[in-house]
């Protein structure tokens, strides 16, 4: 095996870089594309159904399911980014002593995740995530020993599917 063999295995182009991406959730505004620090492309799973016949089992395709999606967001001093998620979550299920909640058409939104080539302009992969809403707006860590770092928080979102 030679180094050239490795590079030939990627004839379609260069290696994908995990730090060249943007997340767009239009509901949260244009600034969110710069506030989302980390994420992963969500998993899609096709469950297997074991079917027995005599003493053998075969597996056939079951239903497709989608795991929750997590994003890491850089917080701003005014806490606008986090408050937008809290407000969005409150559309689904109100906060406080009132029992409120909106219809799915009111709180389910879409997102686009784009991964870029090394020129940071060419989109190499784009997926649209449908039926999103925040199930968990994560905690904000406060620590006197946290110097020279930006405060971040995680948000977990339920989703219907991605394409």
From Swiss-Prot:
Chief localisation class: virion
Calcium as UniProt keyword: no
An example Gene Ontology biological process: symbiont genome ejection through host cell envelope, contractile tail mechanism
Keywords of the record: Late protein, Viral contractile tail ejection system, Viral genome ejection through host cell envelope, Viral penetration into host cytoplasm, Viral tail protein, Viral tail tube protein, Virion, Virus entry into host cell
GO terms for cellular component: virus tail, tube
Cellular localization per UniProt: Virion
A Pfam family: Phage_T4_gp19
GO molecular function, one term: structural molecule activity
Entry function: Forms the central cylindrical rigid tube, which is surrounded by the outer contractile sheath assembled from gp18 subunits. The tail tube first 2 annuli are formed by gp48 and gp54, which are in continuation of the spike complex. During infection, contraction of the sheath drives the central tube through the host outer membrane, creating a channel for DNA ejection from the capsid into the host cell.
Sequence similarity: Belongs to the T4-like viruses Gp19 protein family.
Identification of the protein by name: Tail tube protein gp19
Organism encoding this protein: Enterobacteria phage T4
Gene symbol of the encoding locus: 19
């Amino acid at each position: 095996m030679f180094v050239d063999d490795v590079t030939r295995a990627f004839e379609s182009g260069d290696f994908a870089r995990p730090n060249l991406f943007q997340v767009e959730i239009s509901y949260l505004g244009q600034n969110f594309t710069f506030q989302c620090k980390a994420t992963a492309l969500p998993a899609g799973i096709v469950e297997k159904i074991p079917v027995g016949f005599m003493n053998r089992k075969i597996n056939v395709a079951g239903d497709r399911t989608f795991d929750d999606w997590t994003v890491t967001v850089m917080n701003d001093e005014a806490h606008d980014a986090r408050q937008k998620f809290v407000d969005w979550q409150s559309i689904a299920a109100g906060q406080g002593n009132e029992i409120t909640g909106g219809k799915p058409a009111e709180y389910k939104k879409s997102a686009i995740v784009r991964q870029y080539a090394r020129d940071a302009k060419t989109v190499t992969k784009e997926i649209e995530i449908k039926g999103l809403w925040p199930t968990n707006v994560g905690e904000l860590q406060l620590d006197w020993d946290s110097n020279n770092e930006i405060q971040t928080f995680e948000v977990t979102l339920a989703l219907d599917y991605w394409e």
